[in-house]
Structure formats: C-alpha cells, structure tokens
Amino acid sequence: MRDYIDAVSNQIKFLVARFCVKEFSSVYIGGGTPSILDEQDLSALCASIKSSVDAFSEAVEFTIEANPETVSEGFLEAAQSGGVNRLSLGIQCADDGVLKSVGRRTSRAQILEAVRLIKKNWRGQWCADFIAGLPFQTKAMLRDDLDFAFQNGAAHISLYALSLEEGTPLAKNVAAGVAEYDADFADELWLLGREILEGFGFSHYEISNFTIPGHESKHNGGYWHLRDYLGAGAGAVGTIWMGNGNPALKENPAQKKGVRFANTHDIRKYVNFWKEFEWRHGEEIPRLPCELEAIDLQTEEKEFLMMGFRTSVGVGENEYRARFGKDLAERLGAESGAFGRWRKKNLAHVTEKNGEVFYSLTREGLLFLNRFLIEI
C-alpha cells in the first residue's frame, strides 16, 4: 500500500506543478474506500497533500469518505491529525436485509457502531449518503434512517434515487428475480425523503444534496460550477477548463481547449509509472498512463449549464457572460423559448441575489431536470 501512496503523492506533485497550483480550495479523499488505509498510510497521504502546495490553510474543506465497517478510533484520529475536517459516511440503508440484497459488506450493527465512534471522537462535520428505492426498502426504513442521521448530528445528507445500470450485479439480480426494483416507488421514496429532510430544516441545494444552511459542500460546489479540479489515484479524473484561465492552457493559445484526464484503472500500471516519477516545470512530459480529452468551449458551455441547473441557485447571468461572452436569457430562450415555456408552467424562475440575476428550476422543476436539459 505504501507504494500506492507514494505514487499518488508523486502524481499530486506533478499536477500541482504542471497546472501552476498555489493552493487548494478543497480536498476530497474518495474511493474506493480510503478508510481501509492504515493510520500510517493515511497520515502520509494527508501530509503529502498539504505539502504539495505553497500554502495550505487549515480552514480548507478537507473531506474523506468512509464505509461504516472500516471506521475505527485510530482511523478517525489519523484523519483529524492529518487535517481532515469533514467525514462522509456511506450508509445507503441501515437494514441488514436491504444491505445484503445489494451486496454491501456492512451491517446495521456496524453502522450504529461507526456513528457512535464518530459522535465520541470526531470534532469536525460529518455527512451521510443514502439511497432511496433499494430492494425491499420501505418508507418506514427510510424515515428511520434519515431521522437517525439527523439526531446524531449529520449536517449534510446526500439522497439518491436508485436507478438500475445495465451489467451491474443488482441489475442481474433483478433480471433473475432475486431482487426487486420499482422505479416509480424509488421516486416516491425519494420525494418522501426530501419532505422529511426539509422538515428537519435541511435546504435542498442540489438535486441530490441537502444541508443544514452553512454546511454546503464546497468541494461539490466547485464541481457544479466548473471550477478546475485535479484527480490523483487509479481511476481518478481531473478537469482544467478553458474558461478559468489556467496558465498551463495559455501555453498553446491557438488550441483554445480545456483538458480532462482519466487515470488508468490498472493499479499495477499506475503504481509502476508514478512511484518513482519526478518532473520539473519546463521538462518534456512523458506519455502518461491516462486518457486525455480536449474540451472545446461549446462542450464547456453545455456542461456549465448542465451542472449549474442541478443546483437550486441555478446559473448566473454575469458569470455566464464573463465565461462565454453570450447573453444567458437569449441562450435559454427566456421569453419565448424553452426557459420561457418552463417558467410559464412554474417549473423555472428568475431570481436576484447580491446584484446577480440567476436562472434556475423550481423545486418541482428539478424533478424533470433531464427533460429540461434536452429542451435547451
């Protein structure tokens, strides 16, 4: 495992140098299951992240994901000592039968113990992930799960409606009659979950995310608003957008494209390349073990709108104009086009905040996001 940590650390150093990064606005250690790292490896990874930039503020949102069965006092202490201040716990559902039906390794007892340890030892914010519509899940189960997380201090909850993806174990089990899936009931459960969370005082600030005001995810917010992000580790993805003006992209102004890179999923190949890697700015870059995608401004604009309309705030008129040199109202058809039609149906609206005009979907309109994106 130490070879892998060294490889990740070296890639971070390379990316920071290549894209002229001076500081991080947020850090997210995801997975995979980073909570399986032993305390020494986790400490080494955190130290490497913090030392890779010129300045690392302790106030930076620093998140780590964890599965309940891997949470321990040692893990929590190592994470906190390393600067992590936000813990995301993947609960999904706290019923043993439901968990077994989707092949989860965790159990209800392990979930309860993980939350007990978090309440006892964790000084930062903790968040929980749930899924609505799992096989054999009931309304009572979802209600109890959300209440459990809220009563134990989770200030941010992600709630996803289950959708079957072809080729997954769950899809195969459903096809074989071993598990059940009802898309309509999944949507019904999700709507119930939204009602419950809003009753607790949570704000529905993104299509699948709810928060006690003031505890929004800064890392996810950057992703939704097309901020640049680096991805290090096997299978990780990073994107540097043209519209953010990164100096590295200006080296070839004729190209006028951003870049997205997806690291190889082959862990051995990843480690063999990166564990001894060294590079200094100005040196020729060797062929990297990743797939590269050039992103033109048309694609960037499409993704900007797609991600922005996922949020309750929506897309800002001034930000859009500064980034793409276009009028947002005209692009969306605010008067007689697609946005105008949705607005007449009370599925979209225009709001103003701090002098900025925002175009967004209403609470009801967010339920039909995919249809809206097709129409615009």
What are these regions (language model features)?
Residues 355-362:
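Minor-groove-contacting beta-hairpin "wing" of winged helix-turn-helix DNA-binding domains
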Residues 363-376:
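Short, amphipathic alpha-helical interaction segments positioned at domain boundaries
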Residues 317, 350, 369:
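Short active-site-adjacent structural elements
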Residues 327-344:
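Short amphipathic alpha-helical interaction segments
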Residues 1-18, 22-329:
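C-terminal scaffold of the Radical SAM
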